[in-house]
């Protein structure tokens, strides 16, 4: 049974473009190669501008750890982590199950 990963990132306004590019070119392709499915990715237009919300579908809780361990061992991770350190203010990670009424 799948588990969903809801990630909210508060990103510096000046770093939003760089963050989005890093996700598009590095993180998303790598994590999809690990079997994660990006169910949605959003940039807030109201509330705190620049917040980014990602919704991923994973096989199970262990899938999260396996993919992150593989990413941290990859040559691209150091540059990606440096970009995150410069652009992300905070990150909230939540695991969730699909509600009974979801289609």
Mark where each language-model region is.
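Short, flexible helix/strand-to-coil boundary loops that buttress conserved ligand/catalytic motifs
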Residues: 23, 68, 81
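Short, structured motif recognition centered on aromatic/hydrophobic residues
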Residues: 3-8, 19, 31, 52-58
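Glyoxalase I/VOC metalloenzyme domain signal
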Residues: 1, 14, 58-75, 100-103
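Short amphipathic alpha-helical segments
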Residues: 15-41, 72
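Glycine-rich beta-strand-turn "strand-cap" elements at beta-sheet edges
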Residues: 4, 34-53, 78-103
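Solvent-exposed strand-to-loop "edge" motifs in beta-rich extracellular domains
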Residues: 10-12
């Amino acid at each position: 049974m799948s588990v969903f990963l809801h990630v909210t990132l508060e990103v510096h306004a000046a770093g939003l473009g760089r963050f989005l590019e890093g996700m598009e070119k590095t993180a998303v392709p790598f994590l999809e190669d690990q079997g994660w499915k990006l169910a949605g990715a959003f940039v807030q237009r109201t509330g705190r501008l620049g917040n980014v919300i990602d919704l991923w579908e994973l096989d199970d809780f262990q899938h999260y750890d396996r993919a992150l361990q593989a990413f941290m061992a990859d040559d691209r991770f150091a540059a990606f982590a440096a970009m995150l350190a410069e652009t992300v203010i905070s990150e909230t990670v939540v695991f969730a199950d699909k509600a009974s009424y979801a289609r």
